[in-house]
Amino acid sequence: MCKYCYVCGKSGNLEAHHICKRSQVPALTHCTLNIVYLCPIHHRSEKGIHGRDGHELDLKLKLEFQNKLELLFDKEYFTEEEIRETLGISDRAAKRLLKTLKRKNNMFERSDIIRSCMGGRLYGDS
């Protein structure tokens, strides 16, 4: 599968970027929904997401990820298995993601799931 820089479309010499930092949401470290590929310029330069001027790009990616989660989690409550399958994560990662969330009839509320995936906060008006 050929990968391209999310920003400029260049291929080759790409770096994986976690939209929500691994330190914020360790459970999503291997979740492909939380990863985009960036060229070194858009990843590490001053204009890159980790650079001095990267805040807007970072916010844009977070909003897009949040919107994607809102589309995927399209009902009010989900089981742990449904969450795991939707995110494509392991049992252990799912338990880690959900351990602080309240259960209702052994199910988790949509807004709590999305907030947890986003590192504990929601961004903008989605």
Model-identified regions with their sequence ranges:
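Cys/His-rich zinc-coordinating "finger/knuckle" motifs
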Residues: 12-16, 46-49
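Short cysteine-rich loop/turn motifs with clustered Cys
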Residues: 1-15, 39-41
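Short recognition patches in nucleic-acid-associated and regulatory proteins
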Residues: 13-27
